[in-house]
């Protein structure tokens, strides 16, 4: 069970970082406008 939780935590953190990077880029463009 602990090994499956670690595997699920790795893909979940990568998806969260990719979404945050895209949201931060959109916020910077809106603030410049």
From Swiss-Prot:
Entry keyword annotation includes Nucleus: yes
Tissue localization of expression: Testis.
Region annotation (Disordered) ranges: 1-33
Keywords assigned by UniProt, alphabetized: Chromosome, Developmental protein, Differentiation, DNA condensation, DNA-binding, Nucleosome core, Nucleus, Spermatogenesis
A GO molecular-function descriptor: DNA binding
Transmembrane parts of this sequence: none
GO CC annotation: nucleosome; nucleus
Subcellular location, principal: nucleus
Listed GO biological process terms: cell differentiation; chromosome condensation; spermatogenesis
Subcellular location: Nucleus; Chromosome
Role of this protein: Protamines substitute for histones in the chromatin of sperm during the haploid phase of spermatogenesis. They compact sperm DNA into a highly condensed, stable and inactive complex.
Name listed for the protein in its UniProt record: Protamine TP16
Organism for this UniProt entry: Oncorhynchus mykiss (Rainbow trout)
């Amino acid at each position: 069970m602990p090994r499956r939780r670690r595997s699920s935590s790795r893909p979940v953190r990568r998806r969260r970082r990719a979404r945050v990077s895209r949201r931060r880029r959109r916020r910077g463009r809106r603030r410049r406008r």
